[in-house]
Amino acid sequence: MEARELKANVRKESGKEQARRMRREGLIPAVLYGPGTDPVSLSVNASDLKTALKGAEENVLIKLIIDDSGRLMEKNSLIRELQIEPLTNNFFHADFYALRMDQESTFDVPIHFEGQPVGIEKGGELQYLKREIKVSCLPSELPDCITVDISRLDVGDAVLIGDLSLSESIRCFDSKDIVLVTIAALHGVNKAEETEEASS
């Protein structure tokens, strides 16, 4: 995964009033923290953050270019939490988790399912049982998501975690036997159809 750059400034002041003033100026309060990193209060441009996140999935690698009174420093990070105002849908606060590019970290990677299963046309029910997996890898090896083609799934078929094609550099913590998605037979519907045919 390629890092997306985002400018930030060290925030010297704190408090609700200062946060309100920042938001009126198009900025949002943020914090950077992580192993070996003292928590740093930041401010980032809301529009720049929106641009950095455009088209991104759950995991977004952000290279923060931090200005501390004219002294610049770079920190690779992952957005751990992004608070959004429910009424305006504007960004409210961001948490950045500092990463070391030469050290493996644990991530939750979303699963995207593509295609219309053939089992649906036969009366099966599509059931999503798990939509993400937990992995360990270097930040540069972290995928945006894992795409699974389910168009060939018939009634009774399933996709397990062990069926996923993962890079050798990615280690999955979840059991290979866990079911991600399945096409279940609707026994109740089939039974009703059989009863209807028998009575006709």
Swiss-Prot record:
<dbReference type="InterPro" id="IPR037121">
    <property type="entry name" value="Ribosomal_bL25_C"/>
</dbReference>
<dbReference type="GO" id="GO:0008097">
    <property type="term" value="F:5S rRNA binding"/>
</dbReference>
<dbReference type="InterPro" id="IPR001021">
    <property type="entry name" value="Ribosomal_bL25_long"/>
</dbReference>
<keyword id="KW-0699">rRNA-binding</keyword>
<comment type="similarity">
    <text>Belongs to the bacterial ribosomal protein bL25 family. CTC subfamily.</text>
</comment>
<dbReference type="InterPro" id="IPR020057">
    <property type="entry name" value="Ribosomal_bL25_b-dom"/>
</dbReference>
<dbReference type="InterPro" id="IPR011035">
    <property type="entry name" value="Ribosomal_bL25/Gln-tRNA_synth"/>
</dbReference>
<keyword id="KW-0694">RNA-binding</keyword>
<dbReference type="GO" id="GO:0003735">
    <property type="term" value="F:structural constituent of ribosome"/>
</dbReference>
<dbReference type="GO" id="GO:0006412">
    <property type="term" value="P:translation"/>
</dbReference>
<dbReference type="Pfam" id="PF14693">
    <property type="entry name" value="Ribosomal_TL5_C"/>
</dbReference>
<dbReference type="Pfam" id="PF01386">
    <property type="entry name" value="Ribosomal_L25p"/>
</dbReference>
<protein>
    <recommendedName>
        <fullName>Large ribosomal subunit protein bL25</fullName>
    </recommendedName>
</protein>
<keyword id="KW-0687">Ribonucleoprotein</keyword>
<dbReference type="InterPro" id="IPR020930">
    <property type="entry name" value="Ribosomal_uL5_bac-type"/>
</dbReference>
<dbReference type="InterPro" id="IPR029751">
    <property type="entry name" value="Ribosomal_L25_dom"/>
</dbReference>
<dbReference type="InterPro" id="IPR020056">
    <property type="entry name" value="Rbsml_bL25/Gln-tRNA_synth_N"/>
</dbReference>
<dbReference type="GO" id="GO:0022625">
    <property type="term" value="C:cytosolic large ribosomal subunit"/>
</dbReference>
<keyword id="KW-0689">Ribosomal protein</keyword>
<comment type="subunit">
    <text>Part of the 50S ribosomal subunit; part of the 5S rRNA/L5/L18/L25 subcomplex. Contacts the 5S rRNA. Binds to the 5S rRNA independently of L5 and L18.</text>
</comment>
<comment type="function">
    <text>This is one of the proteins that binds to the 5S RNA in the ribosome where it forms part of the central protuberance.</text>
</comment>
<feature type="region of interest" description="Disordered">
    <location>
        <begin position="1"/>
        <end position="20"/>
    </location>
</feature>
